[in-house]
């Protein structure tokens, strides 16, 4: 479709105004029916026909030229469609071409005249016009304030014919210390706040220029350093740029959205910026890494902590990058007795609304999305920011803080898009390119300033030389002037007689009589010497690029020394700021219960209250038919749980990913968490907090094979699992424990035989090996349990003195805690068992009845009370899922041949399936108090 436009070369005054008329009827233009979209467009952009209030003879007569068949309609003006030169005023053009050209023209107008800053002075046109208008009004940093309305009116009337709100908003932003790293305007009155409070009306607020602005942007404005262009009505001129001495674009940053393009440049520290500029001056081939040594990253006016340097490197290298900013916080202890703490927010990320942040946190707490917070209040005042978030008793401040980072704007990202206007075109630039572009501009400014000063000095020197000639020939000059009948003849006579120029002659005529003394002559002579010296220096400066760069550096350092202030944003290189699930999940203690059928569930430790020895216990939950509890252990949420199967394969999963269930729930099938094969059962679980290099896993099979593997081999496990041990036929992996070379291993068979051996005696092997024989088993006997004796208790193993039975109860730990399948148990001092090598029968540790056998053995006595007794607790689980939690100190200390005491009355609960220990530090004191009352 073609669009009719007027020929721009033909003035509109050369022809009468044209009246638009569609002239379209269905009968005359049937071809338009095929292009309904074009018809709709034409009808939408063409005004409806109106009656012309003039004589018929003066009305326009139109005729149809034709329809080109593609929907293009050509209308010509009969008789009056030609200009005086005979040229037609109707221009035929394609609609898509005209739309493209018009849109590009509009886009470039927005880019260059409104939205994007210039790389050279770092200002958008509106900011540049505001500063220049204030400079013209004489609002220097040492002059009194003037109303902002006066400044806005000056800008609107002379330079920026747009809305007053846009101009005032731009002025306000340049005065806000939380918006600009180095404010360019000093405001007096209400200029808004970090809570997004609006500023007062312009008739109430006052402003003036900052001293930094005068020194950095306006110092050389009157010395022909930049070009001046006509303003919008050609009534006066305005600067196209300001002669910046420091890269203001990097100092205060910029943000703006144009047509199809945007910019977002972070602010930086003045001192670091000048140092980086100096480094580039001394070494134009400096790499980005070398520049980063002087300017390591952005410096935001609101402070905060910049997380990681990868985004900074990418932004400085390519112009695009993502900088993660966190608010600066501190943890305060509110009550030392209850250990209640509070998170104090002292700084927030750049461009974050403080009031909205507080409101968001309150909403999260109210909706129970953010847990552990009891109160929040804003205590900010003139002295600084202080947001207090009080935590509930027992809440982990680190977890609450990580949740704040993830759920609120306390951690936000600044997306760098360093686009600026360079040579009249928008361009994406990195750090070095921005600095180099500024240096090129600054060199031009210094050269133009030097040429301006040189021209003035030469002109003045020329005048001074003429005056000195006149003073040297004073009598002749006076006679010549007295003889002349007019000023013009006097000037002409002086030029002719003394070979002076017109300006020199005029200067002599303008001298007053008081300046004809000898003293004044000496002053002119000294001035001439000074001018010649200045001219020589300026000529030398203009002939040396090195001196120009040196002067640029000196002027930048002068501004740095005068206006520098310390960095506000801290840099944290070790943390990228990316939060994972583990960062927002409390590292609380939890209980894991696994059944033989492969069901697992996670419960809180207080699910089972402490009970007395010999009680029935509490059910751990409903079990499937023919299912029984397999393992029951204590771990923490952040632990990495290693699952070892009966086939010698190991799997891995974070503890917090196991669904939390109630005590009566059946649990989650392990096949939903792990990639188990058909018929594969999990027989042992090891929670690992850290994969230390000096730690090993000791593996023991049912048939008595043992081996030791470095824990590091299991740090990375694929989802399908890896081999942990090679098994012989009819054997299965049953027990896995974590140990070091200085520890000891205690193994026991179902018949009660016990072997103690140093871990160092066990060879360290790879994963895909079988191991060696752990102990000699009699016919029908099998390994029943295994535990580790830490090196800290080694001294107790050296006790080999025979102690009588009456002394056992008063003997301190450590002890071996034996638990039989029928619910009996006892403690035997470790000192009653001597160490032996592998592949031995061992010593008697338990005397069983004919229908009973050993279920588990533990080393207890790690934590002792003031009375020398154990503070640990043991959790017993029966085959039917009943759980009993009792104190270890309530279990009797007996000889190796004793049967023990009743720990749990099983009745119809079957046999003891598994047992686990809970340390004293992990026990809940409220449970202990409840048990004491019940007893």
From Swiss-Prot:
Gene3D superfamilies: 3.30.1360.40, DNA gyrase/topoisomerase IV, subunit A, C-terminal, Topoisomerase II, domain 5, Topoisomerase, domain 3. It comes from the Eukaryota. Residues 116-584 form the Topo IIA-type catalytic domain. Residues 1-28 have a biased composition (Polar residues). A motif (GyrA-box) lies at residues 611-617. Residues 75-85 have a biased composition (Basic and acidic residues). It catalyses: ATP-dependent breakage, passage and rejoining of double-stranded DNA. Residues 1-29, 44-85 are annotated as: Disordered. It is found in: Plastid, Chloroplast; Mitochondrion. Ubiquitous. GO terms for cellular component: chloroplast; chromosome; DNA topoisomerase type II (double strand cut, ATP-hydrolyzing) complex; mitochondrion. The active site is at 204 (o-(5'-phospho-dna)-tyrosine intermediate). Keywords: ATP-binding, Chloroplast, DNA-binding, Isomerase, Mitochondrion, Nucleotide-binding, Plastid, Topoisomerase, Transit peptide. GO terms for molecular function: ATP binding; DNA binding; DNA topoisomerase type II (double strand cut, ATP-hydrolyzing) activity. One of its GO terms (biological process) is DNA topological change. Its EC number is 5.6.2.2. Made up of two chains. The A chain is responsible for DNA breakage and rejoining; the B chain catalyzes ATP hydrolysis. Belongs to the type II topoisomerase GyrA/ParC subunit family. HAMAP family: GyrA. A type II topoisomerase that seems to play a critical role in chloroplast nucleoid partitioning by regulating DNA topology. DNA gyrase negatively supercoils closed circular double-stranded DNA in an ATP-dependent manner. This is DNA gyrase subunit A, chloroplastic/mitochondrial.
């Amino acid at each position: 479709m073609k669009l009719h436009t007027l020929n721009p070369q033909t003035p509109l005054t050369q022809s009468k105004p044209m009246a638009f008329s569609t002239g379209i009827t269905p009968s005359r233009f049937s071809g338009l029916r095929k292009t309904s979209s074009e018809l709709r467009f034409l009808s939408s952009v063409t005004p409806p026909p109106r009656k012309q209030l003039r004589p018929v003879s003066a009305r326009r007569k139109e005729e149809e030229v034709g329809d080109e068949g593609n929907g293009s309609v050509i209308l010509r003006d009969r008789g009056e469609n030609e200009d005086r030169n005979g040229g037609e005023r109707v221009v035929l053009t394609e609609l898509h071409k005209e739309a493209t050209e018009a849109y590009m023209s509009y886009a470039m107008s927005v880019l260059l005249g409104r939205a994007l800053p210039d790389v050279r002075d770092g200002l958008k046109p509106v900011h540049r016009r505001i500063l220049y208008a204030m400079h013209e009004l004489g609002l220097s940093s040492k002059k009194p304030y003037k109303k902002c309305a006066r400044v806005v009116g000056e800008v609107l009337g002379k330079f920026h014919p747009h809305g007053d709100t846009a101009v005032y908003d731009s002025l306000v932003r340049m005065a806000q210390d939380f918006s600009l790293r180095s404010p360019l305007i000093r405001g007096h009155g209400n200029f808004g706040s970090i809570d997004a409070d609006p500023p007062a009306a312009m008739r109430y607020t006052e402003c003036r220029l900052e001293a930094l602005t005068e020194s950095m942007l306006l110092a050389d404005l009157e010395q022909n350093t930049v070009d001046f262009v006509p303003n919008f009505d050609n009534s006066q001129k305005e600067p196209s740029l300001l002669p910046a001495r420091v890269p203001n674009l990097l100092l205060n940053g910029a943000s703006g959205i144009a047509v199809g393009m945007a910019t977002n440049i972070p602010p930086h520290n003045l001192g670091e910026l000048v140092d980086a500029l100096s480094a580039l001056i001394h070494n134009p081939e400096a790499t980005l890494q070398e520049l980063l040594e002087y300017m390591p990253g952005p410096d935001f006016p609101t402070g905060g902590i910049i997380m990681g340097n990868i985004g900074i490197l990418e932004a400085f290298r390519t112009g695009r990058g993502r900088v993660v900013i966190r608010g600066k916080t501190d943890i305060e202890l509110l009550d030392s007795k209850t250990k209640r703490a509070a998170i104090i927010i002292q700084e927030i990320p750049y461009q974050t609304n403080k009031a909205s942040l507080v409101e968001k946190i309150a909403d999260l707490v109210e909706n129970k999305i953010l847990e552990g917070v009891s109160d929040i209040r804003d205590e900010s005042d003139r002295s600084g920011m202080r947001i207090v978030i009080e935590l509930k008793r027992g809440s982990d401040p680190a977890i609450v803080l990580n949740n704040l980072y993830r759920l609120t704007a306390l951690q936000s990202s600044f997306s760098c898009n360093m686009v600026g206007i360079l040579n009249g075109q928008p361009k994406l630039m990195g750090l070095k390119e921005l600095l180099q572009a500024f240096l090129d501009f600054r060199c031009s400014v210094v050269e133009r300033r030097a040429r301006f000063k040189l021209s003035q000095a030469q002109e003045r020197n020329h005048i001074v030389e003429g005056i000195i000639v006149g003073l040297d020939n004073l009598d002749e000059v006076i006679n010549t002037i007295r003889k002349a009948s007019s000023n013009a003849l006097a000037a002409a006579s002086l030029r002719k007689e003394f070979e002076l120029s017109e300006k020199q002659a005029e200067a002599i005529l303008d001298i007053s009589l008081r300046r004809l003394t000898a003293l004044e002559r000496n002053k002119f002579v000294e001035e001439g010497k000074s001018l010649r010296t200045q001219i020589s220096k300026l000529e030398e400066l203009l002939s040396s690029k090195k001196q120009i760069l040196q002067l640029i550096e000196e002027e930048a350092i002068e501004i740095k020394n005068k206006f520098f202030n310390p960095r506000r944003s801290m840099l944290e290189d070790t943390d990228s700021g990316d939060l994972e699930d583990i960062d927002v999940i409390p590292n609380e203690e939890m209980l894991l219960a696994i059944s033989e059928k492969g069901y697992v569930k996670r419960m809180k430790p207080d699910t089972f209250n402490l009970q007395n020895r010999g009680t029935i216990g509490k059910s751990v939950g409903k079990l499937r038919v023919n299912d029984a509890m397999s393992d029951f252990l204590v771990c923490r949420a952040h632990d990495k749980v290693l699952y070892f199967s009966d086939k010698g394969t190991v799997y891995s999963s974070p503890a917090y990913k196991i669904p939390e269930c109630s005590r009566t729930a059946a649990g989650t099938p392990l096949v939903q968490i792990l990639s188990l094969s058909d018929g594969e059962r999990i027989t042992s679980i090891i929670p690992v907090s850290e994969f230390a290099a000096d730690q090993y896993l000791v593996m023991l099979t049912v048939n008595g094979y043992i081996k030791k593997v470095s824990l590091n081999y299991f740090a990375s496990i694929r989802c399908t699992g890896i081999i942990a041990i090679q098994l012989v036929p009819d054997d299965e992996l049953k027990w896995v424990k974590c140990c070091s070379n200085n520890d000891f291993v205690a193994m026991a068979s179902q018949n009660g035989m016990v072997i103690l051996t140093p871990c160092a005696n066990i060879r360290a092997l790879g994963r895909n090996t079988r191991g060696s024989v752990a102990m000699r088993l009699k016919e029908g006997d099998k390994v029943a349990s295994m535990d580790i004796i830490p090196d800290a208790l080694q001294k107790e193993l050296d006790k080999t003195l025979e102690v009588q039975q009456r002394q056992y109860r008063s003997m301190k730990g450590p002890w071996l805690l034996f638990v039989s399948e029928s619910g009996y148990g006892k403690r035997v001092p470790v000192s009653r068992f001597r160490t032996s090598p592998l592949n031995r029968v061992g010593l008697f540790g338990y005397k069983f009845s004919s229908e009973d056998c050993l279920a588990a053995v533990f080393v207890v006595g790690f934590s002792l009370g003031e009375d020398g007794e154990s503070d640990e607790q043991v959790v017993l689980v029966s085959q039917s899922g009943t759980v009993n939690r009792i104190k270890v100190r309530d279990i009797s200390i007996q000889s190796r041949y004793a049967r023990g005491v009743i720990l749990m009355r099983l009745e119809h609960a079957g046999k003891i399936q598994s047992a686990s220990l809970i340390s004293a530090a992990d026990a809940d004191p409220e449970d202990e108090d409840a048990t004491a009352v019940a007893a």
